[in-house]
Regions:
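N-terminal Rossmann-like NAD(P)+-binding subdomain of aldehyde/semialdehyde dehydrogenases
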Residues: 1-115, 152, 166-170
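A short, basic/flexible loop-to-alpha-helix module at the beginning of a structural domain
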Residues: 33, 115-126
């Protein structure tokens, strides 16, 4: 059911991607043909759609009995801190955002041997407790609010309330 909802969200987001990017461009006073409008594509529909696809792949892996991080490179820093290298994952990402890397530095006590015990915890519970989260939409990157919402829904299994700031009204 969750994968089906992600598929529907991906489809609808693709349908409205241009409108979404153009709304951000207009809200920031940029011309649609300005090179700077590309930031609205990268920081809006692209970032959101990319995350949705990764979440879909993660849910499929979990459903198949695999680790949620089975494709993530794990290493240790010189001080012993465990690091998960989560971006880029493929040639397109390397080319699109050259020299842009995303590493997650784990808390003390998390090691390459026990990192699996710390991820996808919601999906390891037999009967998870219901929770409600409040997302405050106040940023100037248009994908942040939907990413926060979907993270809470999918990674933590929480219901979400959202409060948008007036300057983000264009996001609907």
């Amino acid at each position: 059911e969750k994968i089906n909802f992600l598929d529907q969200t991906i489809k609808r987001s693709v349908e409205f991607a241009e409108e979404w990017a153009n709304a951000g461009t207009e809200a920031k006073g940029l011309s649609a043909d300005s090179p700077l409008s590309g930031e609205e594509w990268l920081g809006g529909p692209y970032a959101f759609l990319n995350w949705l696809q990764y979440m879909k792949n993660t849910l499929k892996a979990i459903g198949a009995g695999k680790s949620a991080i089975h494709k993530v490179k794990i290493s240790e820093r010189s001080n012993g801190q465990t690091v998960a290298h989560v971006y880029p994952n493929n040639l397109l990402e390397k080319l699109l955002l050259d020299n842009y890397y995303l590493d997650v530095w784990m808390q003390e006590g998390v090691t390459p041997d026990n990192i699996e015990d710390t991820v996808a915890l919601f999906y390891k519970q037999d009967n998870p407790e219901g929770k409600v989260s409040l997302v405050l939409g106040a940023g100037n990157v248009s994908s942040i609010v939907p990413l926060d919402i979907f993270y809470k829904l999918y990674a933590e299994g929480e219901v979400v309330l959202i409060k948008m700031k007036p300057f983000n009204e264009y996001l609907g």
